[in-house]
Every structure is written in C-alpha cells, then in structure tokens.
Amino acid sequence: ALTQKPNSSIAVGFNYLKEGKIDAFASAGNTGAMLVGAMYSVKTIEGVIRPAISTLLPHSDERLGFLLDVGANADCKPEMLLQFGIMGALYARYLYKVEDPKVALLSIGEEAGKGNLLVQAAYPLFQECDKINFIGNVEGRDIFGDTADVIVTDGFTGNIVLKFGESIYDMIKK
C-alpha cells in the first residue's frame, strides 16, 4: 500500500519520520500499512523481532495500564511476547513514570501451567528475564484492575479484547 500510494498520509508521515523532519508519527489509518511503514521506513530497534501496538487501559484505581499487542501480530513466537513485555515496561516507566511496572501475561488462569501453547512457552522466558518485574499470568477479569501495569498478549487476542472494550463503552453510553 505504501509503494502504491506514495502520496498517502501514512507514506508521507513515515518519510518525514525517516528524514528527521518530525520526531513521531501517529495515524488512525490502516494498521497493516502502519506496521509495514514502521518496519521498512523507520526500522525496528536492533534485536526487536516485530513492533507491537499498545493501548491504554483505565485501571480501577484511576491510573493507566497498558495492553500489547492489540493487533499488529496475530501470530507470535514466545520471544516476541517477551520483547512486547520489555517494550511495554519501558513505555510505562519512561512515558508514564510508573516505577518498576508490573508485567503479566494474559491467560486463562493465574497458574504457571495455564494458557495456550504460546503462553506456556513464553512464561519461563518472562520468569528468567531480569529486565522486567514479571508477576505471572492474569485473567480477563484483571484487565481493568490494578494487578498489572503492562499486560502482554498476541495481537489476535489483544485486538479482540480492545474491540470488546470498545463495545462495552458503546453499550454503556446508550
């Protein structure tokens, strides 16, 4: 899409970012185009397999939490989830001043052995990582609570959570 539409706002925005004309770029445009633009125009940080999309989560204690990935990567490897956790913790720490952010994996149970094969494979990687404050698994009921500051999941699940949350808001405001 970026090569077919070089004058689109997304293509122009990423070119400006690459050339240093702007410091940041955000768009409400196509998610796939944003992912491709980020990976090929700006590149990922060395060692990062894939970027993730994050969303803010309102917490019950009026703070904000973070959920990632919410749609950039439907299929993930365990190492990608760990990188999302590290990036999310850095984001929470440096942009929102969360001291030692609590990082969790979204799963169907709090126990270490719970979850799909991806979550089960990622869990020990999170445990062994000294770059984050890993607190274990959280369940769907914890998403808007204050259990974790950063909740990590694959983009398929995260996008479902995001769209479900949007539908709850729409239902409540009617």
What are these regions (language model features)?
Residues 74-140, 149:
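Glycine-rich phosphate/diphosphate-binding loop of Rossmann-like nucleotide-binding domains
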Residues 39-53, 59-63, 67, 146-174:
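Glycine-rich phosphate/nucleotide-binding loop
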Residues 30-32, 110-111, 156-159:
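Short glycine-rich anion-binding loops that position phosphate/pyrophosphate groups of nucleotides
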Residues 1-50:
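N-terminal glycine-rich phosphate/adenylate-binding segment common to multiple enzyme folds
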Residues 36-41, 79-80, 115-119, 162-165:
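Short acidic, glycine/serine/threonine-rich loops at helix termini
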Residues 27-29, 56-57, 66-71, 106-107, ...:
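Short beta-strand segments
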